[in-house]
């Protein structure tokens, strides 16, 4: 037994320990350094992201919509890392630009941002900012933005897609429309809260006071209340005001017209079906009144018993008013509802 175990012990004693090849040490050292560098780089990215989010939260605590210049835009929006969405309004608010639509859009944008800032769902995943043309001309050129205002969504990862640019001409720039678009792009739902407006209540109180005072002064002679012509005129004025969009103007407060800052051309009719100017309401009111007058003349020519020649002239005048102004009204409708196939005389 002892003789058998002796050769085995001699063979075990004769074995030499195995060592790694000499050329593998640099490889292991390089792999170790690479792991350390990757870990350090990841930590650096996390620290940079935390600093960016902290800075954005600080700006948001001061203002719901913070301004950005070229350097801030490149650092907080274009450069990674990012884990937040950014809504940016590209605008031109300087007085020399004479962009009335920009001011109105800015008010709606501010209402939306305030609604998000003071909501219970507010978090560091969505921020609102704006870039003025006079403070970031290079950004406008880089993104090929030729008109203002323009709303864009910059996602946490990747580049903005076509749907990340808000279709202002088709949808309008109301806070509710912007909130719906943001919900589609970011899955963040914002409930819009508008500040109370007491101008309507004050105007109604003044109107009631005026009517009450008039009735009190004429309390001994109230025959004018039964005047059919007077009530008919009042009814027509109310109908013309409501059908021309005066109530929409009262709620939204649009500008009277829009002057293009590039060529100075003034637009009295907005190209979108969701937005209108005050001048547009006045134009529609006049057109409706002219069509009504034409219909009244046609009715007068058909029912009166006067001279036939005079009735024929009244009929032709009434028909001309209806045909021309209805054609004009239909052309305005076509210009706002793109793709509407029908027209009459005027295209």
Swiss-Prot record:
Subcellular location(s) of the protein: Endoplasmic reticulum membrane
The protein's assembly and partners: Accessory component of the STT3B-containing form of the oligosaccharyltransferase (OST) complex. OST exists in two different complex forms which contain common core subunits RPN1, RPN2, OST48, OST4, DAD1 and TMEM258, either STT3A or STT3B as catalytic subunits, and form-specific accessory subunits. OST can form stable complexes with the Sec61 complex or with both the Sec61 and TRAP complexes. The association of TUSC3 or MAGT1 with the STT3B-containing complex seems to be mutually exclusvice.
Protein name listed in UniProt: Dolichyl-diphosphooligosaccharide--protein glycosyltransferase subunit TUSC3
Occurrences of domain Thioredoxin (ranges): 59-187
Role this protein plays: Acts as accessory component of the N-oligosaccharyl transferase (OST) complex which catalyzes the transfer of a high mannose oligosaccharide from a lipid-linked oligosaccharide donor to an asparagine residue within an Asn-X-Ser/Thr consensus motif in nascent polypeptide chains. Involved in N-glycosylation of STT3B-dependent substrates. Specifically required for the glycosylation of a subset of acceptor sites that are near cysteine residues; in this function seems to act redundantly with MAGT1.
Keyword presence, RNA-binding: no
Any GO CC annotation of this UniProt entry: mitochondrion
Topology within the bilayer: Multi-pass membrane protein
Pfam families: OST3_OST6
PANTHER family given in the database record: DOLICHYL-DIPHOSPHOOLIGOSACCHARIDE--PROTEIN GLYCOSYLTRANSFERASE-RELATED, TUMOR SUPPRESSOR CANDIDATE 3
GO MF annotation list: oligosaccharyltransferase complex binding
Annotated glycosylation sites: 83
Coiled-coil features, chain-numbered ranges: none
Stretch forming the signal peptide: 1-41
GO biological process: cognition; magnesium ion transport; protein N-linked glycosylation via asparagine
Keyword Disulfide bond: yes
Species this protein is from: Bos taurus (Bovine)
């Amino acid at each position: 037994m002892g003789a058998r175990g002796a050769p085995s012990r001699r063979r075990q004693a004769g074995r030499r320990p195995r060592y790694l090849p000499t050329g593998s040490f640099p490889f292991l050292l390089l792999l170790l350094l690479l792991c350390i560098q990757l870990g350090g780089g990841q930590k650096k990215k996390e620290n940079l992201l935390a600093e960016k989010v902290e800075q954005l939260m600080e700006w948001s605590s001061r203002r719901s919509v913070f301004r950005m210049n070229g350097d801030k835009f490149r650092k907080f929006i274009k450069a990674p890392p990012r884990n937040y969405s950014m809504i940016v309004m590209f605008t031109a608010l300087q007085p020399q630009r004479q962009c009335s639509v920009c001011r109105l859009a800015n008010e709606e944008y501010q209402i939306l941002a305030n609604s998000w800032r003071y909501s219970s769902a507010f978090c560091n995943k969505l921020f609102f900012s704006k870039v003025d043309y006079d403070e970031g001309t290079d950004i406008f050129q880089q993104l090929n933005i030729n008109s203002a205002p323009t709303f864009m969504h910059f996602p946490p990862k990747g580049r903005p897609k076509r749907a990340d640019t808000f279709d202002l001409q088709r949808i309008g720039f109301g806070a509710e429309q912007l909130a719906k678009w943001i919900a589609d792009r970011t899955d963040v739902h914002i409930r819009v809260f508008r500040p109370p407006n007491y101008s309507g209540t004050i105007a109604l109180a003044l109107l009631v006071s005026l009517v009450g005072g008039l009735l009190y002064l004429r309390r001994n002679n109230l025959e004018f209340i039964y005047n059919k012509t007077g009530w008919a005129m009042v009814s027509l004025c109310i109908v013309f005001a409501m059908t021309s969009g005066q109530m929409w103007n009262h709620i939204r407060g649009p500008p009277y017209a829009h002057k293009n800052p590039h060529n100075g051309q003034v637009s009295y009719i907005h190209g979108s079906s969701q937005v209108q100017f005050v001048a547009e309401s006045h134009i529609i009111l006049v057109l409706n009144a002219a069509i009504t007058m034409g219909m009244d003349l046609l009715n007068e020519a058909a029912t009166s018993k006067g001279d036939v020649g005079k009735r024929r002239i009244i009929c032709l005048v009434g028909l001309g008013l209806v045909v021309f102004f209805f054609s004009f009204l239909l052309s305005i409708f076509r210009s706002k509802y793109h793709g509407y196939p029908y027209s009459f005389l005027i295209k």
